[in-house]
Amino acid sequence: MKLTLNRILFSGLALSILFTLTGCVGRDAHGNPKGMIWEFLGKPMSYFIDYFANNAGLGYGLAIIIVTIIVRTLILPLGLYQSWKASYQSEKMAFLKPVFEPINKRIKQANSQEEKMAAQTELMAAQRAHGINPLGGIGCLPLLIQMPFFSAMYFAAQYTKGVSTSTFMGIDLGSRSLVLTAIIAALYFFQSWLSMMAVSEEQREQMKTMMYTMPIMMIFMSFSLPAGVGLYWLVGGFFSIIQQLITTYLLKPRLHKQIKEEYAKNPPKAYQSTSSRKDVTPSQNMEQANLPKKIKSNRNAGKQRKR
């Protein structure tokens, strides 16, 4: 059940990213971008792409790469903060596994839906008692802050005048590129593989779907859009790898050491449920009520005496 839920979540995420990118910026009747995100973020990015391409004489391909590097560098701290929150929750869950294991076992061995729900409620209470928030590692606010930048850069790479008629290293930026799509898929597959190396074997089994979902999603989006947008995804893939390397080899080891020291001073204790379990043993009165009543054999005896 948990694995199926993960597959649904990651598949939904893969499909929603493209819709989110296109949804942050509106379009007018002629299909041109419009709206606040475009005016305050997209237009300046488009201006700098045009500046590096024409005024600096670098060409539109290199201009897209430079502007994407600048934008991704600015929002990298938000991505790292999001990774830090997720890693912190993950490390705490790993240390508290012996505490939650008996409750998880009861969930699996539940004989009825009521027993399962009661155990799940107890698990959530135990997680709260130990400072665990299952959704706390998602970090919605940093992601929401990043999405307008992603969306603005996406449209700037697609709609800046001159991009569609330019080439970069023999690649037509106005057309789809199979070579660029293959490179992008390889980058995001490597990033997914790195993320798998940072988790336990049990979590790795549950995350297998994600390892293939992201590259497949990037293949779909990159090959469906002009190569100019593909350059944006290409640079984004390198930054995703950089962020994952920092998370795997810097953040997680430090968090592991920190949490280990915390629990060495204050070892986690088994969770004691405050609510007593409901006694489902039938009482003596209930047993007697459920017994079949004896048929009175002398029910007509009184009538016969009166005769």
Curated annotation (Swiss-Prot):
Superkingdom is: Bacteria
Which residues are listed under lipidation as S-diacylglycerol cysteine? Answer: 24
Extract the Pfam families matched here: 60KD_IMP
Indicate the secretion signal residues: 1-23
Q: Does the keyword Cell membrane apply?
A: yes
The entry's keywords: Cell membrane, Chaperone, Lipoprotein, Membrane, Palmitate, Protein transport, Signal, Transmembrane, Transmembrane helix, Transport
Q: How does it sit in the membrane?
A: Multi-pass membrane protein
Annotated InterPro entries: YidC/ALB3/OXA1/COX18 (IPR001708), YidC/Oxa/ALB_C (IPR028055), YidC/YidC1/YidC2_Firmicutes (IPR023060), YidC_ALB_C (IPR047196)
The residues that cross the membrane are 58-78, 135-155, 179-199, 209-225, 231-251
**Any idea what job this protein has?**
Required for the insertion and/or proper folding and/or complex formation of integral membrane proteins into the membrane. Involved in integration of membrane proteins that insert both dependently and independently of the Sec translocase complex, as well as at least some lipoproteins.
Which protein family is it in?
Answer: Belongs to the OXA1/ALB3/YidC family. Type 2 subfamily.
**What protein name applies here?**
Membrane protein insertase YidC 2
Name the encoding gene, please: yidC2
